[in-house]
């Protein structure tokens, strides 16, 4: 009886701990690489890409989601709206419009380490 009880407690504990996600892997918050792009074609949401607007691409966040993006190198932040899918390069979490990249000081480097947080 005690062995069964211990087995059940161990199974429940393992299941509970394995379902917890670290903050960085939650789709609403994260850190990783970002790049910028300035296409003039349509985005995955169907709107025309405008490099002068504060927008970004993310693999899974809903279109229209507002996200605060902070450049980890200089602390500068910008709020962008998700309107596209991507990036599809390992280690990158966001593709920013040129205007958004300019606001956080990453146009010349092309890429930067960023953290992002969903705000609405």
Per-region residue spans from a language model:
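Secreted/periplasmic proteins
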Residues: 2-120
């Amino acid at each position: 009886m005690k062995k069964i009880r211990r087995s059940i407690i161990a199974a429940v504990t393992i299941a509970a701990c394995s379902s917890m996600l670290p903050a960085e892997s939650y789709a609403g918050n994260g850190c990783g690489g970002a790049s910028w792009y300035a296409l003039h074609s349509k985005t995955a949401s169907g709107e025309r890409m405008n490099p002068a607007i504060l927008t970004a691409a993310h693999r899974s966040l809903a279109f229209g989601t507002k996200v605060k993006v902070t450049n980890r190198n200089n602390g500068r932040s910008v709020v962008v709206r998700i309107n596209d899918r991507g990036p599809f390069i390992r280690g990158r979490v966001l593709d920013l419009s040129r205007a958004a990249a300019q606001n956080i000081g990453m146009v010349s480097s092309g890429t930067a380490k960023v953290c992002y947080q969903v705000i609405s």
